[in-house]
Amino acid sequence: MSRFLSNSDISRLNAAKLGQSVTLGMDSFDCLCRAKEMFGKTGGAFDISIGALYDCWLHEDRTLRQPSPTEIQHAHALTGLNHLELDEDGFCAEVLTEGLQFDLGGIGKGYAAEKVAEILREWSLGQALVLAGASSVLSVSVPEGMSGWPMKLRNPENPNEVLGRFELKEGAVSGSGRQKGQHIIDPRSVDVGPVKGRLAAWSVAPDAIAADASS
């Protein structure tokens, strides 16, 4: 599901022409459906069709560039999941605006964590904690005798400093931050570029996909 692999479903969708129907694997299609659901729930704040804005605002090493107003307007015209149509009967996707660039980075780890949890439940290993990298955690279930999995939220500028502690009983927690570059962009307005004010944000949600997309 990576846009950096030339033969992936997402890369094929990114290369699709206007009106072309692209048949996807079940996981890719399901992930796109959940992404579109979160797009609606967040009022467009979470948007996987943000690739054009990434290319507009960021160099390849994720350092900030200064695009012209024309570049910004063009990138915004190529952003928005309202430009993507999904066919649940045929597991197909069609882009309604040519040039859209999709990136599942904001939801992919959460989706993978949910798939791992499904397998663990099938194997009757429900008392487990799924770690998806350093930023997403999913509690499948808490072992008997525990009130919850101990969680720590650390200062992104000083990992030795613990900002908060809590116990995760059910659901997931996910975090996003700027320590690896200014890659967090609000796609809803042409007047807002990469986030500069806050260093990090965390989200707790009933499932890992919602937590990942909301953070």
Where are these regions (language model features)?
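Mature catalytic core of soluble alpha/beta enzymes
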Residues: M1-S215
